[in-house]
Design a protein with these regions (language model features):
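Single conserved hydrophobic/aromatic residue that forms the stacking wall/gate
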Residues: 1-11, 85
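Glycine-rich hexapeptide-repeat left-handed beta-helix
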Residues: 12-14, 18-49, 53-169
Length: 169
């Protein structure tokens, strides 16, 4: 893409620090099944980065399929974080290294997300939430507070049995 077109896709405000190796405005994982083939869905949106944002080295931030992927004022991203298309990261939120956030996730203001977390698509996390490291977020977080949890490595069949037990409690 031309430099002019890239600038249209990414709007950056004042006092931002973006470390080396970071890619901003890449296409998200947008494909539709057509018979036995996958066809690319055009991502025509953009990335908006607020004031006083710091983005660590080696991060990837996908542009929106339409609309915007938004990183609000005061956000701090550690190294090697992936933000998929159409995400919204609220003001003064900090996210630890190697966290992967799937498409259309909305994280509120003043949150802390520990390293090595995974957040599945379309999740909403309210303001003032702490997610401890290595937590896999699969449900909306509607109440402020601290959350943790991550499965211990075990055979999948055993994990399925244990997860059913946890859901019953």
């Amino acid at each position: 893409l031309s430099l002019r077109r890239q600038r249209q896709m990414c709007i950056r405000d004042r006092n931002c620090i973006i470390h080396s190796g970071t890619v901003i405005g890449s296409d998200g994982l947008g494909f539709a099944k057509n018979g036995k083939k996958w066809e690319k869905i055009v991502h025509s949106g953009k990335v908006i980065i607020g004031d006083n944002v710091e983005i660590g080295a080696g991060c990837t931030i996908d542009k929106a399929s339409s609309g915007a992927t938004e990183i609000c004022n005061g956000v701090k991203l550690d190294n090697q974080i992936h933000l998929a298309h159409n995400c919204h990261i609220g003001e003064n939120t900090i996210i630890g290294a190697n966290t992967s956030i799937a498409g259309s996730v909305r994280i509120g203001n003043n949150c802390m997300i520990g390293g090595l977390c995974g957040i599945v698509d379309n999740i909403q996390i309210t303001d003032e939430v702490t997610i401890y490291p290595m937590t896999f977020v699969t449900n909306n977080v509607k109440n402020e507070g601290a959350y943790s949890g991550g499965p211990i490595l075990m055979e999948h069949k055993d994990w399925l049995k244990k997860s059913v037990t946890l859901r019953k409690k």
